[in-house]
Amino acid sequence: MKFKSIISTITLLCLLFLASCVYNKKTSLEAFKQDVYTPEYATGFKILGAKNAQSTLIQVSNPWQGAKNVTMSYFISRNGELPPTGFTGPTIPAGAQHIVCMSSSYIAMLDALGQVDRIVAVSGINYIANPYILAHRDSIKDMGPEINYELLLGLKPDVVLLYGIGDAQTAVTDKLKELAIPYMYVGEYLEESPLGKAEWLVALSELTDSRDKGIDVFREIPKRYQALKDLTASVEQRPTVMFNTP
């Protein structure tokens, strides 16, 4: 009986060791070619996966005005999986709990997902109307128009959500890399359609490990959009609307 117990223990340890080896095995970058989520309206991102991998890649295309043939990839790590061989972009832990939003648009997306409470800092808090942010402005930090890196380090964020403004943003991302702070460009403002802009909430839901919820939330938006569009189809006098003005 004792001999059988020893054999069973050794077998169990071997299985655990093998599982650990597979668990931490690196997947090649070329293996991430399976479509996990292909947007219907947005053109600036897609989510890719690989066989036998829980982690995913978010690919962001041309994330600022004037960008051409620019593709950035972000590794969304799950279950301790390592970035694929040859990957040099940011690694972001799935289920991000501490998020810095450098645009109010990202706040609205996280709010739609029911995850606005994960925001630890914003840019320009005095110009944000979100009820949760206003109610917690004593604890949510303000990065200001330019990132306060000392403050940012103290927050230990899981990810900083950025908008791209061309070469001027390079200094920011270089500094974030130096500080080992994960970041992701969100290019929703470059989408031509309102639905394309809204669909970026699915990309954010991948960061918070709630992709299914993100897809469900977004699926309802085109229905409401079409209903409002139909409602105004017969309006003859159409006013000019100006927004994002001082």
PLM segments and residue spans:
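Extracytoplasmic substrate-binding proteins
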Residues: 92, 148, 158-161, 165-246
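Bacterial N-terminal signal peptides that target proteins for export
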Residues: 1-10
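Bacterial N-terminal signal peptides
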Residues: 9-19
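Residues at the C-termini of beta-strands that transition into short coil/loop
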Residues: 51, 62, 123-126, 187, ...
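A short, structured surface patch at a secondary-structure boundary
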Residues: 56-154, 159-166
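Bacterial Sec-exported substrate-binding components of ABC uptake systems
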Residues: 21-105, 213-241
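N-terminal, helix-rich and Lys/Arg-enriched segments in bacterial and organellar proteins
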Residues: 6-7, 99, 152, 204
